[in-house]
Amino acid sequence: MMFCSCQSDRYQIDGFARQLEQGDTICIVLENEPERLLGTAIVHQGKFSVTGTTDTILFCRAYLSRMKDCNASFLLEPGTIALELNLPPKPSRVSGTRLNNQWQQLNDSIQRMGTELIKLASTKTPCDEATHRSKLQTIDSLHRRMSACIENTAKRNADNPLGQYIKENYKAPEFE
């Protein structure tokens, strides 16, 4: 009797780089310090591709070699990963695998709340004490929602590398 495993350890990164230039180099590195180069890809007609195998899920980052702030963090795991690299300030995106979809969902939520925070904090119109207090309560509420979003994602993923990454890298604020 012979058994074969249907679980593949192959990954494919399908990269989309419509804002980047033909011939640009994309670096794929381990996210930890010091960063370790795992591979490179060349942008051709707005796309790039990287394939390989991995027996563990790794937290990585892809970035444009000439502009490191054009980057995307992602989990390198078996399957097809879609990576959209965009020039700042447009955020890059990742999807395609279960953990990367959850990572992007977390990033989207934090980005939405962060945009609200910035909008509130940058409003310079004079206001009375009650309006000011209300604004501060809204800012505090957004901070708490952001923290809860991160902590809930960590709890839902406690048994996998996404949850472990959040646990190791996120320090929850101490609210009054």
Placement of each model-derived feature along the sequence:
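Sec-dependent bacterial lipoprotein signal peptides
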Residues: 1-4
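A non-transmembrane, solvent-exposed segment enriched in polar/low-complexity residues
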Residues: 6-151
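Amphipathic alpha-helical repeat scaffolds of TPR domains
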Residues: 159-172
